[in-house]
Regions:
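Alpha/beta-hydrolase active-site loop
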Residues: 1-18
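C-terminal catalytic histidine-bearing segment of alpha/beta-hydrolase fold enzymes
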Residues: 125-168
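Conserved alpha/beta-hydrolase "acid-adjacent" motif
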Residues: 117-123
Length: 168
């Protein structure tokens, strides 16, 4: 809860600054920061673009459907059922897909590595597929594990250049 409140306060602070143009508000992060970027964009409609590299905290309910959840894998299964049903119910509200489903207007770039075993691609896709914004793109990197990958930077730089070009 505190993490999400801090996101909102940080965005409120940025929007209160006299040097903010009143139009452009981009959130960007990787892994847990990617989860925070999706949450920030979902919680604040003033966000104009979101970049999430291998976002964490996606698809917490995956084990209930026999899939692997993304980090941190809150739901433990026991005998085909959640070991703690209260945890299974609660984490749905802290799932990046829950926040992603609220991103209506922001331009979105999501990146995933196909050999990432921390934030598995299926969990990233669960969040990406929840985004209703018409301007969304996912880029797959078949060779990428979790963490920094040089091509992430190239794709991100191109996306940002398109967002920040004069006249946009």
């Amino acid at each position: 809860n505190g993490m999400y409140r801090r996101l909102i306060r940080a965005l409120d602070y940025l929007k209160s600054r006299p040097d903010w143009d009143g139009r452009t508000l981009i959130v960007y992060g990787g892994s847990q920061g990617g989860a925070q970027a999706l949450a920030a964009a979902g919680l604040d409609p003033a966000v104009t673009a979101v970049i999430a590299h291998e976002p964490a905290m996606c698809d917490h309910g995956a084990p209930l459907a026999g899939r692997t959840a993304g980090w941190p894998r809150f739901i433990r299964m026991k005998g085909g059922k959640p070991a703690d049903p209260a945890v299974a119910r609660a984490v749905a509200y802290y799932d990046s897909a829950f926040f992603a489903a609220r991103i209506r207007r922001a331009e979105c770039l999501v990146l995933t590595g196909f050999i990432d075993t921390t934030c598995v691609p299926s969990s990233v896709y669960a969040a990406f597929n929840s985004i209703p914004s018409a301007s969304k793109r996912i880029v797959n990197f078949p060779q990428a594990i979790h963490g920094s990958y040089p091509e992430f930077d190239r794709v991100t730089d191109e996306f940002l250049a398109g967002l920040l070009r004069p006249g946009k």
